[in-house]
C-alpha cells in the first residue's frame, strides 16, 4: 500500500504522446507451443496484467517503466491457447493507485475473473467496498519493481494493508525479495489474513533451494501461513526459453505444501529492467507461455496440478 506522499505527484501522462510512441509495438506474446498435458477444468492463471488505451487509462508519471499495451482480447486469446478459464488480474505499478484499468478488465471478462488492487492511505472504505463488489480480492504491496529492499518499509505497508482489509475476504499480495520475507517472517506468520508472494518469492535459480531466505519461505508455506506463485520463472532463471533451472525451487515449494501453491503466467510479461528512461517504451517480453505451462506440468503430478491450478485459486479468490 502506497503512502499519500508517494502518490501526491501523480498526474496523467500526455495520451497523445504515448499513443505516438506505441504505434509500432511488437505486441503481447501469444503461445506458439501447444500445451502437452490435460489442463484440468476450471484452471486459473493467477498472475496477469492488462495495459489499456493510455487515453482512457493514463499511467502515473512517477512509474519506473512504460509498457506497451496489452488488451483484454489478447488475454482471451492467451487463455484459449492455454485452456485456462479463470484469471486473476494484478494491478501493475504503472497505474499507481488508479485501479480503473484492472477493474474494467475484470468486468469485461466476467465471473471467471478476479483482481488485486493497489491502494494508498487516502483510498476510502467505500471505494474498497465498491472494488470488492467488482471482484477485487486483495491488496498488492510491490517493493521489487522500484528496487525497495528495506524491511521496515515492508512492515509498515503490510500493517497498513492488513488494517484496511478488515473483515473483507481479501489477502495481502507481496512482490519482494527473500531478504525482506526473512526479516518479516514473524509478522507474516502472525497475519490475520492470507499472504501471497509473487514470482517464487523472489528466489533465484542460481541459488537453488539452499539460498538464504528460501528456508523461511518454505516454512511459511509448510505451516500454511503463506501462498507462493510459481509464476514468471524468467525473472529468476538463466535458462530460457523453458526455464527448467527453476524446477528445484518449484518442486521444493510443492513438496512443502501443495495447498499453498498458485500458478501464473505474468502475461503480458512487462520488462521492468532498469536502464531505460521511465517514459521510454519498454517492449513486452516475448515469452512462449505454452512452453512455460508445459514446464510447470513437468514439476507437478496430475493431482498436484489440479490443486495448484483449480482448487487453491477457487478457495483463495472465491471463484
Residue locations for each model-derived region?
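N-terminal secretory signal peptides and thylakoid transit peptides that target proteins
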Residues: 1-14
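An N-terminally biased module of ancient metal coordination in phosphate/nucleic-acid-related enzymes
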Residues: 8, 27-97
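Bacterial Sec-dependent signal peptides at the C-terminal "C-region" and cleavage site
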Residues: 15-30
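H/E-rich (His + Asp/Glu) clusters that bind or coordinate divalent metals
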Residues: 26-34, 210-319
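Hydrophobic faces of well-ordered beta-strands that scaffold small-molecule active sites
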Residues: 44-48, 87-90, 115-117, 139-141, ...
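Active-site gating loops and adjacent loop-to-helix segments of metal-dependent hydrolytic enzymes
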Residues: 51-73, 77-85, 134-146, 193, ...
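Alpha-helical scaffolding within the catalytic cores
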Residues: 71-74, 123-126, 181-182, 209-217
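Active-site gating/metal-coordination segments in enzymes
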Residues: 94-179, 186-189, 222, 227-241
